[in-house]
Amino acid sequence: MSEIISVAFETNGKGYLGYLLDLPGAFVRGKTIDQALSKVEQEAIIYQKWRGLRPRYNLKPKVVQIHYSSLMVEDADSEILLDFDKEKMEEKEFNQYIELIKKSGFSILTIYKNTELKNWLDETRRRKTFYGDVPISIQRIFEHIDSVQYYYLSRISTDIEEKKGFLERREYCLKKLKAIYLRENNSKIYITDHEKWTIRKVLRRFIWHDRIHAKSMVKILKKQKWMGLIDCYQDPFNFFT
C-alpha cells in the first residue's frame, strides 16, 4: 500500500522546486512538476538514510500547495512561506529541527574536512545566478554555506554578534532562534526584504540550504574521483551511495 507524502511547490513557470513537508529540508527540483514529483521517493529514501531511519518505500506524493513566484526558481531561488511554516510548533518538534540542523552542520564539516583538493575548480560549473557567481570549488561552496547562516538568522533577528568558526556560528544562530521560539513559539510572521518568514521556515531553510550545496560539493568530489585525482570521498548525506 502506498503512503502519502505531502509536497509544496514553488514555480516561476521555468522550473519547479518542491519541499517534502514530512522531511524538513528535503526537496526536489525539475523543469516540470511531473519531473520533480518523479524524484520524491528517491529524495525521501536518501534523507531517511541520512537521519539513520529505515527508509519508507512506495511513497505517493500529494501536491498540497503551489506558490507562483517571479524569482529564479530554476536556480533554486525561493521565497515560499509554506502553509505548514505558519502552524503552531510544539517544543519537541522545535528541538527535532535543532538536532537536524546540528547533524546537517556536522555532515557539511565531514565533507569539507575530508576533502583533499578544496580549491580545485570545476570550470563546468562556472555561471552567473541570482546571488552572483556560482561557487566552483568545495572551498567556495563551504564559505557560501557558512555565510548564509547569519543571513537566515537576520530574517527574524537584528541583534547578531560575529562568532568565529562554522560550528560556533551555527550554535550561536540556534541559541538565538531558541530564545525567539521560547518567547513567541511560531506565532509571528516576519516580513524582511519583502519576504515572509517564520521560525519554522528559517529552520527548514537551514537544512535545505545545507543539502542543496552539500550535493554540489559531493558532485565535485565524485568528478575528482572519476578523473583519478582522489581515491575516495565522504558522502554523509548519502546522495550517491
Language-model features, listed with the residues they occupy:
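A short mid-domain helix/strand-loop element embedded in enzyme catalytic domains
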Residues: A76-K88, I101-R126, F142-Y151
